[in-house]
Structure formats: structure tokens, C-alpha cells
Amino acid sequence: MRKNIVAGNWKMNKTLQEGIALAKELNEALANEKPNCDVIICTPFIHLASVTPLVDAAKIGVGAENCADKASGAYTGEVSAEMVASTGAKYVILGHSERRAYYGETVAILEEKVKLALANGLTPIFCIGEVLEEREANKQNEVVAAQMESVFSLSAEDFSKIILAYEPVWAIGTGKTASPEQAQEIHAFIRSIVADKYGKEIADNTSILYGGSCKPSNAKELFSNPDVDGGLIGGAALKVSDFKGIIDAFNA
């Protein structure tokens, strides 16, 4: 059965001390609650080893925002999936639009990253989505289907371990949001191509998150769609009251 998930993506924010404080604050905010969704925080690498033991693992999962496409070796500045896993982190965001746009991550590179993450026991949160020009040209389905090739090389067993996140790139950090109807339409399309590849059962069990200016004021409406299983949250994840407001959308 697929899960409802609210995952925070801190991006390149928070010093070590600030990150520890934010994680502690979130942990305290959820201390006496039982959220109706899985809660995940994905942090910069420097926070992982400190934050993971601080939070209640029964309520908050911890993940990285990226990992290398190589297992180990002379790759200065890179952090491997094995290293991420050694901190106790359980998740890793892969294929975020910022990584694709600014760091040239391709279908082939992401295919390697996904395989290494899975081999080291990490759950990939695999991101897909179109830019404004592609949306205006009505090419969003074509773009998303091409991006999914990075994970469609996986066995059915491995694919069933990943989480998908649809992010309309034109809505990230812009204040624009896909309408609930737009979100449902493309989430349903994504689920349909998963079903075509792996069958209806795996498709029905795959969590597909929405990532694009999701906030407490619109989360409930977005999450009420049958194919929207939660959110990948950027800016709102840096403020506990906002992040908890989104988590609470599943309690309303």
C-alpha cells in the first residue's frame, strides 16, 4: 500500500548549528503527535551525522539531497551513497531540477545514482518535471516520460522501493503553483506510465509527491487528489510552523 509522505528539502541552507536547532524544533513539534503521513527531512551532507541521532526515527526519516554516481575513489568533493548510508540516513533526493539544470545531471548519470543508492539501502526520492517553456508547449508528458528512463531500467523489485516526486520547475520558488487539477492530471499520467512498465499493482503502490510552492494554505487541496500522495517541500521546510502546517494537511 502506498504511503502519504511529506519530505522537506533544505537545499543549501542552514549552518550545522542552525540545522541541528531546526531538527530539534521539528522533533519537539511532533513529540506528542502521530502524523498521518511519513515525515522526512533531507539535509545538506554536513548535517546528516548530527541530525539523524537527534530525531525520533519512528516519526522523522532523514535523507541527503544528492549522492555521487560513483561508488568510491578519486572523485574529489563527491559523497557516495555508502557514505550517506553510514550516517544513518535512509533517503536521498535524486534528479532534482536544480541538479539537472545547474550541474548537468543526465538520464545516464541519474540511472547510476539511483542504482548506487538502492545498493546501499537508501530510498531514492526521484524527481521529474518540466520547465515553463515545455509546459506552455504542452510537452510536459513527453518530458516526464523521458526523465523516467533513469528509473525504468530497474527491476520491478527495485523500482517498488523508490518514491517519485513531480516538480513543475516553473513553480519552484516562484510562488506559482500548479492547480490541483494540473497536479492530478500529470500525477495520473506518471502513474499510468509506471503501470505500463511494471503493472498496475506496483503503480498503485508507488508514492508520487508534488513539489512546487506547496504551503500550508494549499497543501490540503493538493493532497486531496487521488494521485497526489504528499509533497516535496522546499522553502516551507525551513520553518517548523509551515512544515508542520503541511504535515497537518493529512490530519484535517
Curated annotation (Swiss-Prot):
One Gene Ontology biological process: gluconeogenesis
Pathway: Carbohydrate biosynthesis; gluconeogenesis; Carbohydrate degradation; glycolysis; D-glyceraldehyde 3-phosphate from glycerone phosphate: step 1/1
Residues in coiled coil: none
Gene Ontology, cellular component aspect: cytosol
Major localization class: cytoplasm
Record keyword Cytoplasm present: yes
Sorted UniProt keywords: Cytoplasm, Gluconeogenesis, Glycolysis, Isomerase
EC annotation from Swiss-Prot or TrEMBL: 5.3.1.1
Record GO terms (molecular function): triose-phosphate isomerase activity
Keyword DNA-binding: no
InterPro entries named among the record's database cross-references: Aldolase_TIM (IPR013785), TIM_sf (IPR035990), TrioseP_Isoase_bac/euk (IPR022896), Triosephosphate_isomerase (IPR000652), Triosephosphate_isomerase_AS (IPR020861)
Top-level taxonomic group: Bacteria
Subcellular location(s) of the protein: Cytoplasm
Annotated active site: H96, E167
Binding positions (substrate): N9, W10, K11, G173, S213, G234, G235
Catalyzed reactions per annotation: D-glyceraldehyde 3-phosphate = dihydroxyacetone phosphate
Known role: Involved in the gluconeogenesis. Catalyzes stereospecifically the conversion of dihydroxyacetone phosphate (DHAP) to D-glyceraldehyde-3-phosphate (G3P).
Annotated family: Belongs to the triosephosphate isomerase family.
Subunit organization: Homodimer.
Name of this protein: Triosephosphate isomerase
Lineage: Bacteria, Pseudomonadati, Bacteroidota, Bacteroidia, Bacteroidales
